[in-house]
Amino acid sequence: MPAYFQRPENALKRANEFLEVGKKQPALDVLYDVIKSKKHRTWQKIHEPIMLKYLELCVDLRKSHLAKEGLYQYKNICQQVNIKSLEDVVRAYLKLAEEKTETAKEESQQMVLDIEDLDNIQTPESVLLSAVSGEDTQDRTDRLLLTPWVKFLWESYRQCLDLLRNNSKVERLYHDIAQQAFKFCLQYTRKAEFRKLCDNLRMHLGQIQRHHNQSTAINLNNPESQSMHLETRLVQLDSAISMELWQEAFKAVEDIHGLFALSKKPPKPQLMANYYNKVSTVFWKSGNALFHSCTLHRLYHLSREMRKNLTQEEMQRMSTRVLLATLSIPITPERTDIARLLDMDGIIVEKHRRLATLLGLQSPPTRQSLINDMVRFNLLQYVVPEVKELYNWLEVDFHPLKLCGRVTKVLNWVRDQAEKESDLQQYVPHLQNNTILRLLQQVAQIYQSIEFSRLASLVPFVDAFQLERSIVDAARHCDLQVRIDHSSRTLSFGSDLNYSTKEDSPVGPFLQNMPSEQIRNQLTAMSSSLAKAIQVIKPASILQDHEEQRQQAITAYLKNARKEHQRILARRQTIEERKERLESLNIQREKEELEQREAELQKVRKAEEERLRQEAKEREKERIMQEHEQIKKKTVRERLEQIKKTELGAKAFKDIDIEDLEELDPDFIMAKQVEQLEKEKKELQERLKNQEKKIDYFERAKRLEEIPLIKKAYEEQRIKDMELWELQEEERITNMKMEREKALEHKQRMSRMMEDKENFLSKIKAARSFIYEEKLKQFQERLVEERKKRLEERKKQRKEDRRKAFYHQKEEEAQRIREEQLKKEREERERLEQEQREEEEREYQERLRKLEEQERKQRARQQEIEERERRKEEERRAPEEKPNKEWAEREESGWRKRGEGESEWRRPVPDRDWRQEGREGREEPDREDRDLPFRRGGESARRGASDEKGLRRGCDDDRGPRRGGDDERPPRRGFDDDRGTRRGFDDDRGQRRGDDDRGPRRGMDDDRGPRRPIDDDRGPRRSDDDRGPRRGFDDDRGPRRGMDEPRGPRRGADDDWGPRRGGDDERGGRRGMDDSGPRRGEDSRPWKPLGRPGAGGWREREKAREESWGPPRDSGHDDDGGERDGDDQREGERFRERRSAREEGSAWRRGGGGGGGGEEQSSWRDSRREDFDREDRRERRDMRERRDDRERDIRGPQRDQDEGGSWRRGGEERREERKEERDAPPRPRERDRDSGEKSTWRSDKDKENPRRTKNETDDDGWTTVRR
């Protein structure tokens, strides 16, 4: 390729310029570069003329390989855009090649070429022959002129067929070119090229069947494709018959039959008729008269069934030909001595089976079967009368003396029809041979011996030599018993009595058997003759004996008939079963053998396929490598040639030879080319720069020299312009004066006609004034009418507009009234709902107040009873302090001695006033938050789905009853106990302490026990518990904090919480199941988990727990005994996991809406919430400790499992601790510590779905969670 790139239009102009000066090769190179260029791979309109010019040059220069490469490139360019352009280009290319070949043929006198193969024009034999014999001028002219063009045309056909194969878009063009190639072979008698063309077409068809998955592949199931292929194959068959290439014709027949098999629909009758006609010719030329006749039979039946316009003459001609062809089939079997010796019967049978398949027959035909079909279909009635009796003479009648004379008449008639029926002449020799054979068969049945001259006189249409040859062939192939005696010139028949005829001996007219047949059947004939004689001469006694024997036989038969019948049936059944068993065994064995053979064949086939695949892969790899090498060499050569064309490139590569291309590297060539381009660019820049300087100097000098000249020329031009202006001005003044004089003359002449003009105008106005007044009057009348009409229409329109406006206003008023009515009804309904809610709130507050009063009284009674029981217990336990001395000796392991006082945080507070102040206003609202409503299903009211603790009162609990009838424990509180009451006597929840800041109770993940009413001493709820609600349906919880509290909806129909505030209540869910925030009245500060307790004492651990502001980890004092130790530890681990931020927007933390501050929106309960909660937790904790002491006293001392645990100590030590605690002054409550911390309890749902939160704490300790 050149260093520069040309546009296609410029390349075409450049090529035409080369052609004008007679340079075809440079023009071809220019067009070749454009076609090979990768920058124009998209088809454009200019590509077609470029390609036509390129192919024209290829034809003129006979460059078939360049034409092939260009066509392939053009196919890639236009295949997806304009395939019609490719068709036009290919047709134009072939047309040019054909015209050039025809021109060369006209100039040459050689009509038929003597060259066998155009691919190998000069064979060694032809070279030697030309050297020995020499050649004249004409022969040399023919060889140099016609042969190259014929070869070029053949290569053009072959290249175009390879280009267009297996492409559905150009399928029609492909078949047209194939048919043109057949005509070319027929025109120039190119047999070798015809064979190659047939092989190529067969190979292309195989490729179509293999590569049918390609995008442009031909679909052989398409009827149009099948018809085009059949048409091409029929042309091939016709050409092969014309060129007498019978082997190729037979292959074409097989190809046509294969196409028939591919087609799902039957072929057209016209196509099948043409096919049968061609096949019959092929069979006759191959010497197979049997299948030739069978083909004519098929053609005859097809014509009778499908042709509606079949004339009587055509039917007569076809039936006559079928009759002659059938009778012309040789009577003797077509088998030579060599075939008999080599045992080729199987091969012959297989050949006949294949030929029968080509005709669509299930089994091969025979001569006798064809004759029977001819008789069965009554074909003889359509035969011409001259030939009609030929069948009877040869196949039915037995008349040897007149046979040849009758047949001679028919043969003479056939010869006379040579001009009309030329196809019938080919049957005459075969009919003569069959007639001679029939004559010999019939003569052999009559005569024992006959003279040769006598026999020759019976066969007038052959000479003696042919007759003798026929006799010998009949004796050898036809089982004819004949001997020729040349000494006496006689023939003897049936002289060999030991001769036995074969099974396939021909059958014909029969009179009697031969002597050998009589000798072979002599005993049978003698037996039948003797039986007849005995029947004639035997006496009556013999007949009577025979009758008696017959009667005895009948009697015996009747006696044993049934048994014999059963035996025969049984034997038949046995035979059938045995045959079936043998047959099944044979079938099974054959099946196994078949499977084994198939497996072996499959294995061999797979191995062969794998081998072929590997070989193909290796060949493909080798081919790709060779192509890459060739492309590399070609690229190196092209680049080297391009660089050498330049001056610098010639200097750089002057020492490199083209033959050394294998050692060159394309990168090296590219580097050289780039270097050469850079040098050229630099040289050009320097040259331009020097020229620029020269031009600048020259231009400056030139302008300096021309300045005075320009001034001088300017002055001269100015003087000339002034003179010209003065001259023109004088001429203008003179012309104006002349024009004024002419105008004055014209005015004087026209003024004389002014009077006539005035008179004419006055007459015209007088005549037309009346018409004007009439038209004006009519116009005024029409104007008045039109004005009235329009005013009336305007009035109607205004009236219609007012009516529409009135109705529209009326509808709007009605709509407004309806909306006001709906608004009033909605406001009234909201007012009634508000009143109802307020009434329910007042009733709820009243009921709550009564319940609080009742609970207060009950709590006082309980305190008095518990105090009394405690004192009795202390008095009873006092004498038993000494035996428990051993428990006090382990102080170093964390147990407190009896003499020690209780810890400060357990010591009761002396005065009771500070515990009770403000209690009346807070106690019941707090109760509302600490108690949950009645829950259906019997499950625990406080425990969630993730509660891992056991039941508080399980069936396997070994502790004593809580408050049974036989419980001897004293009451929990006395009358002087100033602590707040627990919610029930046997509340089994973990005790709360004064500094206990655990999170609020929750629904699903709360691990604390359920709270109970005052008088409920039952265990926790279970799944099958059918007890009543915890607090009854008169739930005494406080009212909701506000109208817009965003708590969740009610849980069910039996929910006894306070009423909803209205239809627009947007509160969140109740805090029983999924409320993740703390409840009102609880301490919102989180607890801090402790580590594993060390070896210190009880007070040290309690002090550490108090400092951590969290519940104890290792000393959980609840009523579950030792079974709670592991649970407490696991709960300590889960506390860390559940400490996460609660969902934002929970308005229960702020006491109202979430928008304002906490002080303005909190309710009346929030002021002293924390003091009351801390007191209540401390009271419940003390009550739990006393109950545990009583239980331990009953069970006796236990062996401590964990020295660091405080829940295993005896009751005596704990009583001492409680005494010390009561005597010690109370610790100041740290109620405001860690007020900014938030509760971090989480439910399982919260653990699974963590959310990003932001917590804010106000002055009162309320935490607001924002999203």
From Swiss-Prot:
GO molecular function: mRNA binding; translation initiation factor activity
Assembly: Component of the eukaryotic translation initiation factor 3 (eIF-3) complex, which is composed of 13 subunits: eif3a, eif3b, eif3c, eif3d, eif3e, eif3f, eif3g, eif3h, eif3i, eif3j, eif3k, eif3l and eif3m.
Family: Belongs to the eIF-3 subunit A family.
Ranges in a coiled coil: 82-118
Function: RNA-binding component of the eukaryotic translation initiation factor 3 (eIF-3) complex, which is involved in protein synthesis of a specialized repertoire of mRNAs and, together with other initiation factors, stimulates binding of mRNA and methionyl-tRNAi to the 40S ribosome. The eIF-3 complex specifically targets and initiates translation of a subset of mRNAs involved in cell proliferation.
GO cellular component: eukaryotic 43S preinitiation complex; eukaryotic 48S preinitiation complex; eukaryotic translation initiation factor 3 complex; eukaryotic translation initiation factor 3 complex, eIF3e; eukaryotic translation initiation factor 3 complex, eIF3m; multi-eIF complex
Superkingdom in the source lineage: Eukaryota
HAMAP family to which the protein is assigned, alphabetical: eIF3a (MF_03000)
Keyword annotations of the record: Coiled coil, Cytoplasm, Initiation factor, Protein biosynthesis, Repeat, RNA-binding
Gene3D superfamilies: 1.25.40.860, UVR domain (4.10.860.10)
Organism of this sequence: Danio rerio
Residue span of region Disordered: 792-1267
Any Pfam family hit: eIF3a_PCI_TPR-like
Subcellular location: Cytoplasm
Descriptive protein name: Eukaryotic translation initiation factor 3 subunit A
Biased composition (Gly residues): 1150-1159
Region spans: 12 X 10 AA approximate tandem repeats of D-[DE]-[DE]-R-[GP]-[GPQT]-R-R-[GPS]-[ADFGIM]: 956-1073
